[in-house]
Amino acid sequence: LALAHMGQRVLCLDCDITLRNLDLALGLSDRALMDFSDVLEGRCTLREAAVPHERYPSLSLLTAPMADRPLSLSVPKLQALAREIRESYDWCLIDAPAGLGQGFQMAACMADQVIVITTTDVSAMRDAQRTAAELSAFPSGTVHLVVGRVSKKVLRQLHTTIDDAIDAAGLPLLGVIPEDPDVPYCLNRGLVLREQNYYAAR
């Protein structure tokens, strides 16, 4: 949203096949009728499938399909879609699903840079470490770590630090997102954190 406010053309690409939810977070669930599989298979164009935000027209969403079985995602088609996105937008933010399945592989195939987002939970840090290992083919300096839901109280209780998360993932730290109870409230209602001036958006 900050990029869109600066006049940049931004596309949010949801790669969470069958379990998409980025449309809900952006308040676009009733408008996202076509998905990236429709573009890949030639049923519509990228421009037709990408849904612009009503209040922020330079911010658009290309959602994931609600498929009940794995899709046939060929690398040449994905690369062609990536080229078209680069020509049409200044930024493409790809939301990869948890795990190392088809959606993750698609995101990794199309991305130029990667941000691994984790929390200070032990299980989350282990997942981040595994994800970082899968991304070892990316050039040095293109994969970074963001630690979310950080509160001083939780850090004291768990006897963990941000350094532990960095060491576990083996990635350079890009930033830290503080714990904010208003985040789930906004997500459930499709509200924009930045508009409400909530803590995590400052």
Region annotations inferred by a language model:
Residues 137-202:
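C-terminal lobe/tail of nucleotide-utilizing enzymes
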Residues 17-19, 67-68, 121-123, 150-154, ...:
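Conserved nucleotide-binding/hydrolysis micro-motifs of P-loop NTPases
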Residues 1-15:
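A conserved segment at the C-terminal end of the G1
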Residues 4, 108, 136:
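Gly/Ala-rich phosphate-binding loop of Rossmann-like dinucleotide-binding domains
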Residues 12-87, 184-189, 193-194:
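P-loop/Walker-type NTP enzyme "switch/lid" segment
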Residues 125-140:
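Conserved C-terminal guanine-recognition region of P-loop GTPase G domains, centered on the G4
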Residues 86-89, 101-122:
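Inter-motif core of Ras-like GTPase G domains
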